Amino acid sequence: MPSFRTLTLTLCLATLAVSTRAMSQGGTPPEVLLRLDDVGMNHSVNTAIERVARTGMPFSVSVMFAYPWYQEAVEMLKKHPNVNVGVHLVLNSEWRNYRWGPVLGKTAVPSLVDSVGYFLPSTREFLDSKYDLGEVERELDAQMQRATTSGLKITYVDFHMGTAGATPQLRAVVERIAEKYRVGISRSYGEVSNTIFSAPVDQKTSELIKGLARAERGRTNLWVIHVAERTPEMDVLFDRNNAAQNSGTGVPLVAQHRQGELDAMLSRELAEMVKANRIKLVTYEQLNARGGPRVRPPVP
């Protein structure tokens, strides 16, 4: 005959199992923020963003206002109020044979550019250069002015390739700009950061789904995504900073990777995962509405 202690332990375990199951089924749903980067890079990225926007799902996009195709992105985004807009602050130009420079022009910020007036290719090269912090602030402010006068509502900023936040001094510049324009800074809301950037092309969707299945409750789970339609203009893009984006023989794979991430965003599996797990998709505009824009990470 079972002892009283055994019966008590069994009852406690059964109660715990029921409580855990109830929490998983009826507790606070996981919160996920989808941030799609590099908007305005080219036509193929812009058309991919529009395809995702047409699904109606809420998500955030980071527009690069120093990029050649930002104006097309602006006009497209005005048609899709479900899309929240931020600024991808740019201090680098990473592609081979496809370059850009500062909004202010090379003569206004000479310490930020190479000999022909383009941004430097990598974060390391930028940090090793003799950049002037005052020029950094003026250029990033010019990018923000272009963004805020575009007709789009801007709610946050982030850093292309991490460069604008790579040192405490650079971060302080961005914080001043964010406060000036009353916007938040991505990853300053206590987000759990995730990406499928380095996932194999044929595993982008499955890696995203597996990651969402592990989403932390009580936290904002940030997923940084890079989408594009695979087109001739994308097929020739060679990433000079990330070997995983090119084959071992030097063939560019960027187009395949970004098409894979677009496929993941448009997949039936993603839609079913969001519905089945009651995932709450949020944007930075919603995070700001909770307590104002955040420009500094929360203290642990």
Locations of regions flagged by a protein language model:
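Acidic (Asp/Glu)-rich catalytic clusters
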Residues: 49-55, 72-84, 101-114, 148-149, ...
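Catalytic domains of cell-wall/extracellular-matrix polysaccharide-remodeling enzymes
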Residues: 130-210, 214-216
